[in-house]
């Protein structure tokens, strides 16, 4: 049997409001529905998926800091509005040396000007933006493929 892969999914501020917050941009599914769907997919891929959501920057930083001791091999992060403001989350991701994908439900590059800059994209393994909730599944499948290729 293959070794189990540990992936952490982090969702940032206001993503707890998915389903009711601007459904024309973010869709009608709740964060719980999105996470449940990706957790089902993770089982099929032999992945243990841990999920975490916070509106507090320092809690996200602490969660990232703990990734090494928790044997996390890959991070999927939708930083929400912290994408455009948080150097501390960027620094935390850079410090731990664990690959990550930055995920956005909407296409941040096709929205307001202030949303088009990401403090994390240049250190991310990749950015998945504008695919709606399906972006989470793309990120999960691609992270697994990345880790399996890295093992070869």
UniProtKB/Swiss-Prot annotation:
InterPro entries: DHquinase_II, DHquinase_II_CS, DHquinase_II_sf. It catalyses: 3-dehydroquinate = 3-dehydroshikimate + H2O. The keyword Amino-acid biosynthesis applies. GO terms for molecular function: 3-dehydroquinate dehydratase activity. The keyword Lyase applies. Substrate binds at residues 78, 84, 91, 105-106, 115. Its EC number is 4.2.1.10. One of its GO terms (biological process) is chorismate biosynthetic process. It comes from the Bacteria. It is an enzyme of class 4 (lyase). The active site is at residues 26, 104. The record marks 21 as: Transition state stabilizer. Pfam families: DHquinase_II. Pathway: Metabolic intermediate biosynthesis; chorismate biosynthesis; chorismate from D-erythrose 4-phosphate and phosphoenolpyruvate: step 3/7. Keywords: Amino-acid biosynthesis, Aromatic amino acid biosynthesis, Lyase. HAMAP family: AroQ. Belongs to the type-II 3-dehydroquinase family. Catalyzes a trans-dehydration via an enolate intermediate. Homododecamer. This is 3-dehydroquinate dehydratase.
